[in-house]
Amino acid sequence: MIKHRIMSAATLLGGVVFTGHAVAQSPEVARRLDAKYDVVWPAADGLIRVNKGGYRIPDSRMKSNGKYGYADTLGQLVVPPAYDDAADFGNGHAVVGRKAGDGRMLYGLIDRSGRVVVPLEWERLGGVRNGVCVARTGTAAEREFLLADTLGNVRSLGYDYCSDFSNGLARVGVGAYVEKENVAGITLRDAYEFRGKFGYIAPDGGIVIPVQFDDARDFAQDGLAQVGIQGKYYVKWGFIDKSGRQVVPCNFYSAEEFLGDRAVVSKVVAGGKLAYGYIDRSGKEVIPCQFDMASGFRFANTWVGMEQDGEYTYTLIGPNGETVLPFRVGDLQDGGKYGHAAASISDAAGRKLFGIVANNGKVILPFEYDHIAIFSEWDAANNRWQESAMGTKDGQNFSFDISRRGE
C-alpha cells in the first residue's frame, strides 16, 4: 500500500475543520511512523495522528476503512488506532468518531491519555475552546445544541443553532432549518440550512451580543466579526467588535475578514455587477470597488483581476492600490505559503508561457514553461513548509525548490 504524509495539520470532521499547532518530530521518528502506518499527520499539541488501513484522497479526508490513533513525538503509540474518524489534538483534547450500528458517525472527546471524557454519542462535536466544546444531536430540521466541558458535563444551550467557539465567542441563532435546493442532484453533506437571527455567547453559555443579525460570521483574532443586516434586496455586511459595537457600517454586498489593515469588500454597481475593493479598519474605501476579483492581503501585496469575455487577467497591487507588477498575467495560482504565484503571459503568437512571481513582484522563474504548478508540503524535521514547483517545457519535466525564494 502507498504511504502518505499529510501536507496540512487540518482535517474535516463532522463538517467542521479542526487545526492544531504543528510541532516538529525528528526525521527518525517520522521514518518509523511512516513505515508502520498508512497515513501520518504533523504533530499537533504534542501528539501525532496516525491512520492504519486508510489512505489520503484529494480533499484530505480519509476512506472509512481506516482506523485512527495517536503517537507521541518519540514515536510511541499513545492511543491505539480504534476510531473511524479523528481530529488533531488541541488544548489537551481531540474529537474522535466511531460508526454506530445504523451507519451514523457519532463523536466524542478524549484526553491525552486516550480516556473518553465526552461519550461518543453526538452527530457533531467541535474542538475544545476555552475549556468547552459545542455538541449537536439531530441531523435534519430538528436539532439540539449543547455545551460540553472537559469534565464530561453536558447541558442544552436552548438555541436553534450554535457554531464552535472562535476567539472567545460562539455564534448562536434563533430560527428554523429549511431544506436546501439541490439543483445538481448530488449528495449533500447537510441537506438543511439554518435561517434566522444571530447573536453571540460566551463559553459559560451567557449571551454577550443579543440575537439581532440576519447573518453573521465568527470572530477573528483581531476581535472583529462580519455581521449582516437585511436590506431591500440583499443582506448588507459590516463589522462589529466583541462588545457588539458597530465599527464598520453594514453597507457592503460582501465583506471578508481583515488581513492586516485591509479587508476585501464588494458593492453592486451599474448593471447589477459586483465590483470588489478594499476598506481600512475605519470602514473607509481605500482602494475603490472596481475589480472583478480581489484577494486578501495575506502578504505585503495582493492580486486583483478583471474579466473580459470570460477570461481573467490579474495585477499585483500594494495596500494603497499601487501597481507592483508592471504587466498583467493570466491563469493565476496564488496559493503558495510564501506568497509565490504561478501565472501565464502570452507571446506574440498567442501561446501561453508560464512562470512564477514572488509577492514583491520579482519574477523568480521566467515565463518560458508550458505549464507550472506550485506545491507546499510540511517539513517536520525543520518545522517549516517546503515549497516546490513542477514545470513542463518542450515535453520535459522540471522541479524547483522555491521555499522563500525571492523574498
Question: Model features per residue range: what roles?
Answer:
Residues 1-10:
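Bacterial N-terminal signal peptides that target proteins for export
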Residues 25-407:
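Residue-level detector of conserved, function-critical positions
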